[in-house]
Every structure is written in C-alpha cells, then in structure tokens.
C-alpha cells in the first residue's frame, strides 16, 4: 500500500515545531503537524523509534536472531485514530493486523468469546454461550452490564473496578473482569479506576460493530507504525534526530512569547512526547528561565514526576516446531507462583512455529527477581498450556511500563507553558495507558498548535 501524500497546509504561515520523543505519541503528533503544513524537527534519545512499543531482537534456541517486541501489545477495533495514522504513513492494516472477535478463553475453551455480531447481540450471545459459566453467572453479568448502561457508564470518581463488580460471582471475576481489567488498565480490580474501566467498556464493547475486536500484530511494533512513520516523515521533509538527547530548553523572550530554543535552535513551539520523568526534567529546565508562568510550569513538572507506575514483563519462550496454542491469544490463570495472565502464539502471528510470548501485567504479580519470574512463568505455561518442552529465550521487564491508573491519580494536563505542550498516554485524558491513548494525545496537541 503506497503512503498517502501530506494534504495541503491548514495554515497560511507554517511554524517550526520541535517534537521531543519518537514513541507512538510523538510520531502521531509529528505526522499530524506535517499534514497541517508545519516544519517539524523530531528528537529521540534511543537508537530506535517507538518508545516502549518497539521491535527487539532475541536469539532462538539455535542461536539465530528473532525479531520480537519489547512487550506484547494488543490493539482493538476501537483504536480508530491509530488505524487511520497507520494507513496515512503507508501501513497495510489488513495485512499487518490479525482481526479476531474478543476472546478471553483459556486453553481449555473456558471463558468468554464474542461472535462477530453488532452490539449488544455479540455480548448477549457470547455470554450465553460461555463455557464453564453457570446460568446464574451469565445472568449476573448481563444484569450488571445493563445496570452500567442505564448509568451511562458513569460511577463515583473514587470507585475501583472491584467496587463496580461487588457481588458478582467469583467465576466471572476470574474469567472476565480480572483479565479485562489487567489487560486494559494494567492493574488488579481492587486498585484500578472504575471511571476509566467503564469508559473502556463503553468505547469498545458498546461503541459499534468491531470495536471490541482484537487486533494482533503480524509484524513487529516498529514496522507497524513508528519506524514506518519515520520514513514517511523524512519523505515529507521533516528533520529527524535519532539517538540524540535534548539537553537544553530555553524560552525566547519573556515567558516564551516568541517560542523556544531547543539546544540553541529556535522553534515557534515545542511538544514534549517523552516519558513523564523526562518531560518533567525538561519542564524544570524550561521553568528556570520563565517569569510569570514559572510556578505553573514547576507544578506541571511535579505532577509528571510524581506519577506512580506499574511494571509489565514478557517472557519469550520456544517449544518444538509443531507445538502451538488453540488460538493466537489464550488466557492463563494467574495466582501465587503463577504470575502470567496471557500467552500469545507468535507462530500464528507471522513468527516461527513454537514461539510464545507470556505476558505478566500488574506489578503486584511480579516476583522480586527476574530469574524467579522467568522460572515461575515457564512452569505455569508448561502446565496450563500442556507444553512440557517449552524453553525460555529471554525475559523483558519494563519497570515503568504504564502509569498506575488508580481512581485518584493526578495526571498532568497537556499544556505545560506558553507554546510548550506535552503528549503521551500519561497526560490527562479519559483512557488508560494504551497505544490509542498515546496516539490521541499526540493528535490533540498537534491540533492545539
């Protein structure tokens, strides 16, 4: 699929905009700014594009290189902005993503799988056909979903997901609520924000046909968007600096009335698309030279720096060719000594047969050391997936993978200071830390310029 050309400028006077950070949010903002006719310069400290959602090379059991991902990410059909951006930069979405109805079943087929029907019929039929659930379980979930819908998917701001689900049968919590909550918010139900959880349900399960579909990447995450977007940006005339860290951010004129200097280079505006910690560092650098807006900028930096985070780990493992899972994604039963929640058969997603990704979300489930984590996860997968020959290749741990989406978390706003903005999945918004949240944040800030 050929890359779409940049449309004509939406502004009569293009601006010079610096985007600091080449993850999904920064790339989304850069593409949108170029489409609007602005001159974009993009910096990325690492030697790869994509931030936490990027390609990674590991060695298989024979010592041969394999391209995987820094962490196994799931997209869903409701990720409309991400899908549109992929198409803009030339990604063949239909070939690059495997679309499946929502499937949270384990290796024995127990749990929920939705049919390919429009809502609410998909949920109603999926719940009615769920294996391993009693009719009491099914009625309880349908009744609770109807209650959430009557409440317009709103709840008390301080409520957790556990509060929303109080009284539901344990089987439903184990087979549906917990896997969905951990995969979407990366927190157990007792800690996760009820408000955000209901928003995710509304915008995926109840938004329209296909919104809850799983979209599993058949290629590495770098090719899926950020690396491909970098090539598109270069073709459109943007300036990209890979492997270069921004050290200095200074205002031009009193309180940046004339813009900013990024490492001595003048720009009309700056967009911080880094991690929250790095954005806080740059904001403090900027605040030191501000006057009337200094305290506001320092306050923003304090919020960004104080955000609590949770970890995600991925154990890549391989079993003899010919071994595999009944579906590309299978739920695992987690608990003490069994930390993983999902297994992905990468052999069904464009990778070599027998390659598995075992995902451990929610930091409470992570053992203290990586060796114990890998051993426990491997033993769990061998037993629950009936793969005794499974051997570990590499364990990847992102200690600050996502901000902790608790009911009372204070997320910083997108506006930092005059002509200085921030974007990322941690910035104030209705969604948890997801790829779509990052992309939408980048697009919204680009529009603000």
Where are these regions (language model features)?
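N-terminal Rossmann-like FAD-binding beta1-loop-alpha1 element of flavoenzymes
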Residues: 15-42
């Amino acid at each position: 699929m050929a890359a779409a050309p940049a449309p004509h400028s939406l502004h009569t006077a293009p601006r010079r905009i610096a985007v600091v950070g080449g993850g999904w949010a920064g790339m989304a903002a850069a593409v949108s700014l170029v489409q609007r006719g602005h001159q974009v310069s993009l910096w990325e400290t690492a030697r790869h594009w994509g931030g936490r959602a990027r390609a990674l090379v590991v060695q298989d059991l024979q010592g041969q290189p394999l391209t995987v991902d820094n962490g196994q990410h799931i997209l869903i059909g409701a990720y409309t902005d991400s899908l549109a951006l992929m198409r803009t930069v030339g990604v063949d979405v239909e070939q690059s993503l495997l679309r499946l109805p929502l499937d949270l079943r384990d290796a024995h087929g127990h749990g929920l799988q939705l049919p390919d029907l429009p809502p609410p019929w998909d949920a109603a039929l999926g719940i009615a056909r769920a294996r391993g659930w009693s009719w009491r379980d099914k009625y309880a979930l349908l009744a609770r979903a109807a209650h959430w819908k009557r409440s317009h998917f709103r709840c008390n701001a301080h409520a957790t997901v556990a509060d929303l689900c109080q009284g539901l049968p344990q089987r439903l919590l184990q087979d549906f609520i917990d896997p969905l909550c951990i995969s979407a918010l990366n927190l157990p139900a007792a800690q996760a924000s009820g408000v955000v959880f209901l928003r995710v349900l509304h915008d995926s399960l109840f938004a329209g046909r296909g919104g809850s579909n799983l979209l599993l990447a058949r290629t590495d995450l770098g090719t899926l968007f950020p690396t491909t977007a970098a090539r598109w940006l270069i073709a459109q005339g943007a300036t990209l600096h890979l492997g270069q860290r921004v050290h200095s951010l200074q205002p031009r004129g009193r309180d940046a009335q004339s813009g900013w200097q990024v490492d001595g280079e003048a720009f009309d505006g700056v967009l911080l698309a880094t991690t929250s910690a790095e954005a806080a560092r740059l904001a403090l650098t900027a605040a030191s030279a501000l006057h009337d807006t200094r305290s506001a900028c320092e306050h923003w930096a304090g919020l960004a720096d104080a955000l609590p985070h949770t970890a995600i780990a991925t154990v890549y493992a391989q079993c003899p060719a010919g071994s595999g899972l009944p579906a590309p994604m299978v739920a695992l039963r987690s608990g003490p000594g069994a930390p993983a929640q999902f297994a992905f058969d990468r052999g069904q997603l464009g990778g070599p047969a027998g390659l598995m990704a075992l995902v451990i979300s929610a930091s409470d489930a992570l053992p203290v050391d990586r060796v114990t984590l890998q051993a426990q996860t491997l033993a769990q997968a061998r037993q629950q997936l009936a793969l005794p020959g499974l051997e570990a290749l590499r364990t990847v741990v992102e200690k600050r993978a996502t901000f902790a989406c608790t009911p009372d978390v204070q997320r910083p706003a997108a506006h930092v200071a005059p002509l200085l903005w921030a974007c990322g999945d941690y910035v104030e918004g209705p969604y948890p830390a997801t790829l779509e949240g990052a992309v939408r944040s980048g697009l919204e800030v680009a529009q603000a310029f």
